[in-house]
Amino acid sequence: MNRQPIVQLSNLSWTFREGETRRQVLDHITFDFEPGEFVALLGQSGSGKSTLLNLISGIEKPTTGDVTINGFAITQKTERDRTLFRRDQIGIVFQFFNLIPTLTVLENITLPQELAGVSQRKAAVVARDLLEKVGMADRERTFPDKLSGGEQQRVAISRALAHNPMLVLADEPTGNLDSDTGDKVLDVLLDLTRQAGKTLIMATHSPSMTQHADRVVNLQGGRLIPAVNRENQTDQPASTILLPTSYE
């Protein structure tokens, strides 16, 4: 029996007005994401990667089409229902860490959960467990300005996973880091999501960030185009994908 896709995009389009004309960023995309897989969304700056993640999460609504997450038609819901669903079921990791400077590492992770009604004690237990997993158990009382960029992103990843979301969206999560630090942070993100069986959709402009993905799709001309490997063999790892010439 085939598994039901966790995310289904159906005829999804998004346009915006630029002067007297309308620009089409996403063009009637239909695509399924499977439970527990890591999909790398590869595209140049301005190709619409962030917009697509915003539509999946319900931050924005499409011009046409639908997004369904585990049977929940998020595009058809009210703003309040979309917000509550996002809070409970989706974890988001951004390029910029967005940590609150006046809160400690532990408090940055626990605050969203406390605002959602989780007890302070329970939120702290979860946060400490995540900090242990990302190698920052000794930094829970540290403030963000005392952390390196890689450490701040580890905290942001922990915050995104603290509520045990079914879906994790990562928008250029290593884009503000140097190459070595970015690789280590990506390893942390992949380890945590795979251990927990989460679906991870990561937007990136860097082909090197796609090598561990289960699937790679290129966002070009408003469309999602599945990548193929150089030998045209489906059993090859994602690191052998054939990239559009604009990325090579």
Swiss-Prot record:
Can you quote a single GO CC term? plasma membrane
Query: Which first-to-last residue range defines the signal peptide?
Result: none
Residues recorded as binding ATP, renumbered to this chain, are: 43-50
InterPro entries per UniProt: AAA+_ATPase, ABC_transporter-like_ATP-bd, ABC_transporter-like_CS, ABC_transpr_LolD-like, MacB-like_ATP-bd, P-loop_NTPase
Q: Which BP terms from GO are recorded?
A: transmembrane transport
**Molecular-function GO term, any one:** transmembrane transporter activity
Function description: Probably part of an ABC transporter complex involved in host cell binding either through secretion of an adherence factor or through maintaining the architecture and integrity of the mycobacterial cell envelope.
The family line of this record is: Belongs to the ABC transporter superfamily.
Q: What is this protein called?
A: Uncharacterized ABC transporter ATP-binding protein Rv0986
Give the species.
Mycobacterium tuberculosis (strain ATCC 25618 / H37Rv)
